[in-house]
Amino acid sequence: MIDNNQTCAAGQDSVPYVTCMIYVLEEWLGVEQLEDYLNFANHLLWVFTPLILLILPYFTIFLLYLTIIFLHIYKRKNVLKEAYSHNLWDGARKTVATLWDGHAAVWHGYEVHGMEKIPEGAALIIFYHGAIPIDFYYFMAKIFIQKGRTCRVVADHFVFKIPGFSLLLDVFCALHGPREKCVEILRSGHLLAISPGGVREALLSDETYNIIWGNRKGFAQVAIDAKVPIIPMFTQNIREGFRSLGGTRLFKWLYEKFRYPFAPMYGGFPVKLRTFLGDPIPYDPKVTAEELAEKTKNAVQALIDKHQRIPGNIRSALLDRFHKEQKAH
C-alpha cells in the first residue's frame, strides 16, 4: 500500500500541493493528523481573538503600574539621597522614558515629525485625545530623551483618584489645573500640554476623528496670560490603536452623570503611529481667547485633514508600518 508521501512523490494530480506539504510535515515532526491540530489551533484563535482585543488596552494600564512599582523601588533605594539631591528623579525619568520609547519603537514604529518646532523656552502644546493617549506617553519620552525636558500635562480629575497613580503623576509633573498654576508653569519656561477635548473626546470621538472641544477656551486664555506660543499636535492612527465603546447612549449617560469613563475599550493593535507638530501659533496681544481657541482648533483639524485617512481603518493603519510616509488624504 502506497503511503501519503509516496503518493505525493508520484506526482498524482488528485493530491493538492497543500495536502502534500501537510503529509511531509507530519512525517518530519513525527506526528499524525497534523491537519486536525492546525484546524483546532485556528478554532482557538477564532474563539480567543475577541478576548485578546479586550485585554490588550488594559495591558497599557498594566505597564503604567509596572512603571509605578519601579518608581517606588527607586524611591526606597534613594531615600537617603533625596535630602541631598534636587534631581533625585532624573535617573528614574530617564529609565522610564527609555522603556516607553523602546515600546513605542517596537510596537508602533513610533515617529515624531516637527520636533524642531518646539522652542527652547515655554510653549503650550494642544493635542487631540485618543481613546487611550498612549501617543502622549511616547511623546513625553521622546521630549525627555532628545531635549532633556519634562513636558507637564493637565490631566482629568479622575486620573488623580486612580489607586497608586499619585507617585507617577508627581514624578512626571501632571496637574489638574487651575488656570493660575498653568500660567505659572509656562512663565517659568516649561512646556505644558493640554487636550481641550479631554476624556469626553477620548470616549465620544471615533474613527472619523471629530474634534470635541465644546466651548472650551480656557487653554487659550492660559497662553495669552503667559504670553507663549501654542503648538498644535496630532498623532496619525491613534484611533486605530485603541477604540472606545463610549459612543453608546448608556456610556454617554454614565459619563455625564458620574464624570468617570466607564466605557470599555478594545484594541492594542500594533498600528503605525506618527505624531505631527504643527507650526507654532505665536502670542498676539490683540487676539481674544475665543479667536485663539478657534484658530488652534483649526490648526489641529488641518493636521488631521493632512495626515489622517477618514474614516480610520485598522487594516490600513497596520499596513502603514511598511510605508515610509503615508500620503496626505
Swiss-Prot record:
Recorded topology in the membrane: Multi-pass membrane protein
Parts of the chain on the Lumenal side: 1-50, 142-329
rRNA processing as UniProt keyword: no
Keywords: Acyltransferase, Endoplasmic reticulum, Glycoprotein, Lipid metabolism, Membrane, Transferase, Transmembrane, Transmembrane helix
EC number: 2.3.1.-, 2.3.1.20, 2.3.1.22
Cytoplasmic topological domain: 72-120
Catalytic reactions of this protein: a 1,2-diacylglycerol + a 1,2-diacyl-sn-glycero-3-phosphocholine = a triacylglycerol + a 1-acyl-sn-glycero-3-phosphocholine; a 1-O-alkyl-2-acyl-sn-glycero-3-phosphocholine + a 1,2-diacylglycerol = a 1-O-alkyl-sn-glycero-3-phosphocholine + a triacylglycerol; a 2-acylglycerol + an acyl-CoA = a 1,2-diacylglycerol + CoA; an acyl-CoA + a 1,2-diacyl-sn-glycerol = a triacyl-sn-glycerol + CoA
MF annotations from Gene Ontology: phospholipid:diacylglycerol acyltransferase activity
Glycosylation sites: N5
Compartment annotation: Endoplasmic reticulum membrane
Chief location: endoplasmic reticulum
Transmembrane segments: 51-71, 121-141
Keyword Transcription regulation on entry: no
CDD domains, alphabetized: LPLAT_MGAT-like
Regulation: Acyltransferase activity is specifically inhibited by TMX1 at the endoplasmic reticulum, restricting accumulation of triacylglycerol.
Tissue spec: Widely expressed, with highest level in the brain, followed by lung and duodenum, and lowest levels in tongue, testis, skin and ileum.
InterPro entries: Plipid/glycerol_acylTrfase
Residues the record marks as active site: H129
Family: Belongs to the diacylglycerol acyltransferase family. Highly divergent.
Function: Catalytic subunit of the alternative triglyceride biosynthesis pathway, which mediates formation of triacylglycerol from diacylglycerol and membrane phospholipids. Synthesizes triacylglycerol at the expense of membrane phospholipids, such as phosphatidylcholine (PC) and its ether-linked form (ePC), thereby altering the composition of membranes. The alternative triglyceride biosynthesis pathway is probably required to provide the energy required for rapid growth when fuel sources are limiting. It maintains mitochondrial function during periods of extracellular lipid starvation.
Protein's recorded name: DGAT1/2-independent enzyme synthesizing storage lipids
Phylogenetic classification of the source organism: Eukaryota, Metazoa, Chordata, Craniata, Vertebrata
